[in-house]
Regions:
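Ankyrin repeat A-helix N-terminal signature
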Residues: 499-504, 535-541, 568-574
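Leucine/isoleucine-rich amphipathic helices and adjacent mixed helix/strand linkers
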Residues: 15, 45-70, 83, 149, ...
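Conserved ankyrin/ankyrin-like repeat signature
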Residues: 507-508, 543-544, 576-577
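N-terminal flanking helix/linker immediately upstream of nucleotide/cofactor-binding cores
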Residues: 1-45, 49-63, 117-140, 153-161, ...
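Mid-core helix/loop region of P-loop NTP-binding domains shared across ATPases and GTPases
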Residues: 31, 100, 104-144, 150, ...
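Ankyrin repeat domain, specifically the short helix-to-loop turn at the C-terminus of the second helix
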Residues: 511-519, 546-554, 579-586
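Start-of-repeat signature of ankyrin repeats
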Residues: 493, 528-529, 562
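Ankyrin repeat boundary signal
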Residues: 521-525, 557-558, 590
């Protein structure tokens, strides 16, 4: 969570004043009852820079001795599976709180002993409330940045719980306070029910003139810094001309300014005329800037693959992981043969870092050897949320990507990697094989998300590594078991069909049912005594359930606790699966 905060730049002195001096913030900071402040502003207006400054510069407490015991915890959401999780947000906040006040960990011990680290959202929230209610807890301020990038279901749960907490404490002093930042989305208005909350609602968009004034401060500060760093330094007249030219742009945002300043910084031009000429070609919008950046890709095909992998990744990939994944994709496309990792021609890390920057330029950023898109708007540039896509070409990048196609690329990299010969690798040296852990844990998720694009060719590949009698299966599955011990995985000594149904691998299930007409659809796992249909129902895999029902799988087969597939689907809220089972006359009272 610290990396997610620190990826944002520090504020320039004199900026964020539109917020720091606002009466509503000052009132919220003093007040012990009004304890929710929601800050909304459009993309690229510096919300995350503001949140980072609030944490790092100690700007949240009024200046009096009573606030020295205040705990400050934070979470910066990003629109991907790992960083966009409300569960991970609560885990991170509790981790920070317990680090600052170790004695509060007593409120989590019983739940941890019962459920291990895989605690639910509801349990984590309950632990937070118990901890802040401790008489020795002291005040706690939580900053939730970019809440709009939180995954929908846990975002709704977060908002519901924050709202309920504040409604319950609206007449008494509260030790728990929140600052939430987001874009000004109507759906968040509805979820928060702002009119009913004892909250302070600050519309950052209403402060646009002040924000633009502060952006001008950043322009002046950064041009001056760039000018001094040049050899020879840029003279004052050139700097003034550059500043004026950038400040004359009407629709400037922090993000646009950042991209433009990088253009100036990278340029080798040093005369006033040529630098002003450069600015004359600078795009007038962030989207135009993104298009221009990607058109410069030294190898557009490889750049496209890199961006697919970034978009699909369950967590940010490291340079070493990306290097391996990209090499596998390129070698397969070229028809080159390889059987072990030694056959892959990988760059040294620093050389690969430069390669990524040559491929994607300012569209990506690399922090602590992890690769990120420069901003949430970069993802929105590549993927049209409305579903319409444009045909891709090296000169047209906007709206040319889909998540499904991106997951297909990630799936190919993971599947083909896991089919390499790893039999002689001792577990102690697996860290030297950077993609191994990621591929073992996440390939099944990419398979699910690729949908029908996980075609027969990849289905056959997946079928091979789901062969529970093969060493390849045991290799990746044991890694998964080690790193996901509380996910209630079936034991490894089960049928191929049961494993494929557990993970929702539709085309693998289809192949098994086609290739083995007499396959046993009622084989139960050795730990929970559940059938393939029971696992597919529990996990909500509609298409897999349909295939099994077509094979007349027993809809009433009980597990060791007496639960049937219908029980499993009902307990986990899978409505469509419930309907399918009831259509097959599953016993309601079974």
């Amino acid at each position: 969570y610290q990396d997610q905060k620190d990826i944002n730049p520090e504020r320039v002195q004199g900026t964020c004043e539109w917020f720091l001096k606002h009466p509503k913030f000052l009132e919220w900071r003093r007040d012990t009852i009004a304890n929710l402040l929601w800050v909304t502003a459009g993309p690229g207006c510096g919300k995350s820079v503001l949140s980072k400054a609030l944490v790092d510069e100690g700007l949240l407490n009024p200046e009096n001795p009573d606030t020295k015991t205040t705990s400050i915890c934070y979470y910066f959401f990003k629109d991907d599976a790992e960083r966009g999780s409300g569960v991970n947000a609560l885990r991170s906040i509790l981790h920070q709180l317990f680090k600052q006040k170790l004695w509060l960990i007593q409120h989590a011990i019983n739940d941890y002993r019962t459920d291990g680290p895989n605690l639910s959202f509801g349990t984590l929230w309950a632990i937070l409330i118990k901890a802040v209610s401790d008489t020795n807890a002291g005040p706690l301020i939580c900053i939730l940045d970019a809440l709009d990038e939180c995954e929908t279901s846990t975002r709704k749960s977060l908002i519901k719980n924050i709202s309920s907490f504040h409604c319950a404490s609206k007449t008494t002093s509260s030790t728990l306070k929140f600052i939430v930042t987001s874009r000004p989305y109507h759906e968040l208005d509805i979820d928060f029910k702002v009119d009913d909350l004892p909250s302070i609602h600050l519309e950052g968009n209403q402060m646009s003139e002040e924000i633009r004034g502060e952006i001008d401060l950043v322009i002046s500060h950064e041009i001056s810094r760039i000018g001094r760093a040049r050899q020879p330094p840029l003279d004052g007249e050139i700097q003034a001309s550059l500043i004026q030219h950038l400040q004359d742009q009407k629709n400037r945002t922090y993000l646009w300014v950042y991209l433009m300043l990088q253009e100036v910084s990278k340029s080798l031009e040093s005369t006033k005329g040529k630098l002003i000429g450069l600015l004359g070609t600078i795009p007038s919008s962030v989207d135009e800037a993104y298009e221009k950046i990607l058109k410069r890709a030294t190898d557009p095909i490889q750049a496209q693959k890199v961006l697919c992998l970034i978009l699909a990744a369950e967590r940010p990939l490291t340079l070493k992981e990306m290097n391996t994944a990209l090499e596998i994709l390129v070698m397969n496309e070229c028809g080159e043969k390889y059987t072990s990792e030694n056959d892959l021609v990988l760059d040294k890390e620093e050389a690969f870092r430069k390669k990524i920057m040559n491929l994607c330029g300012l569209f990506v950023t690399i922090v602590d050897s992890k690769i990120y898109l420069i901003h949430q708007t970069a993802k929105e540039f590549l993927i049209n949320k409305k579903g319409r896509t444009n045909p891709w070409s090296p000169s047209c990048w906007k709206y040319t990507f889909t998540l499904q196609a991106s997951h297909l690329e990630a799936l190919k990299a993971c599947l083909w990697y896991l089919r390499l010969d790893f039999q002689d690798i001792p577990s102690s040296s697996r860290k030297d094989h950077p993609l191994l852990l990621y591929a073992s844990i996440h390939w099944t998720f990419h398979f699910q998300q690729a949908g029908e694009k996980a075609d027969k060719e990849l289905g056959e590949n997946a079928l091979q590594i789901c062969n529970t009698k093969a060493q390849t299966f045991l290799f990746w599955y044991r890694i998964l078991q080690k790193h996901r011990p509380y996910h209630h995985l079936p034991a490894e000594n089960n049928s191929d069909l049961l494993i494929a149904c557990y993970f929702g691998l539709t085309s693998v299930v289809q192949l098994l049912l086609w290739n083995k007409p007499n396959i046993d659809t009622e084989s139960k796992d050795t730990e929970y005594d559940r059938t393939p249909l029971s696992w597919a129902s529990k996990n909500g895999y509609v298409e897999v359930v349909k295939l099994l029902l077509k094979k007349e799988a027993d809809v009433n087969a009980p597990d060791q606790s007496g639960s049937t597939p219908l029980h499993q689907a009902s307990e986990n809220g899978h409505v469509e699966v419930i309907k399918l089972l009831l259509d097959k006359e599953a016993g309601v009272n079974a």
